[in-house]
Amino acid sequence: MVKNNILIFALIFIFILIFAIRASTFGVYNLDLNKSYNAYKKDYMSKDGRIMDPERDNSTTSEGQAYMLIMSHALNDKKTFDLVYTWTKNNLSRKDKLFAWLWGKNQDGKYQILDNNSASDADIDIAFCLLSAYEQWNDEKYLKEAVPIIQAIWDKETKRVGNHLILMPGVKQTTSEKIEVNPSYFSPYSFRLFQKYDDKHDWNELVDSSYFYLSAVMSKTRTGLPPNWFLIQNGQIIIEDSKRGDFSYDAIRVFWRVYSDYKRTGEKRAVPILEKVNFFIDKWKTTQKLYTNYQSNGELRDKDEFVGSIAILIPVIKLYDKKTAAEIYKSEIVPYFAKDGYWQNKHNYYARNLLWFGEYMYTNKSLLK
């Protein structure tokens, strides 16, 4: 009997040892997403559901509200989800059912909307989260809130350019002759869900145009990476020779959006886009560095290794090279996770969002259900 117990304990020990070695090899460090989420709420969220950016005088954006909806939905935190959406609706809603993108303190010290223009990426994320909440929690109120927003996105934030319908960055930009486009706003998985609940519009056309323009604009950069912004003028795609034409803090989200669509649907058009992470895999293997800001001509803009961008890249890199993804994760992500539940800079709101999203996706979870 004693021998049997010893054998059992020995087998358990060996199993634990093997798992520990495998975890170390493949980057399974089980960083506590709940702990990070709670720290995020403590650091950024007011009692009434407003997300504040400490690096921008505690201002609030529709993007920040949307990101908190994504996180709270992913962790099944209905109470926080409702709190954040209620604040968003009460304080950022426009007459057309979209949301003002910037809210904060004016020159007189009064808190109000500072810029009433919309931001289509946030509007899309909010509507998507409401539909996802409806499906997850089976509450009709979320569907009733989502449908008018979806219709307003179509009516106010899309524009036909030649043979293609394109997503505009906001309401004001739809009236300009020179069309400015942010490709990181393209959200094919959201458009597919909108189609499910809106049979009046062809949202699949917007899926198609998203992939068309992503492919077209990425073919014009030497790195093959998407730019932060591009222009459409006289039917031609133009990438500006400035930071707006760089692959940087905005453009990194293209990988999040396309990866999410690929994981949900297996979309074949996503593959050539996601394969561009091989650029970073090659850089890592030769330099052990992962610089994240590149000009469209292929040259480095600077030697910034923005940890938020790296976090978004790792799940995509994992599709093509698990070993390299694990190396980067161990070297560039794990050391920055603080005991208080935040990564690297406690006050960098944008980096902490991207880090949380990247970590969630890297640990084989579907961020956007």
Give the positions of each predicted feature.
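N-terminal Sec-pathway targeting helices
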Residues: M1-I12
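Low-complexity, Ser/Thr/Pro/Gly-enriched N-terminal "stalk/linker" regions
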Residues: F19-E63, H73-Q107, Q112-I113, G162-P169, ...
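Aromatic-rich carbohydrate-recognition surfaces in CAZymes
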Residues: N58-Q65, I113-Y134
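Inward-facing hydrophobic residues that define packing positions of alpha-helical scaffold repeats
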Residues: Y85, L130, L143-A146, I150, ...
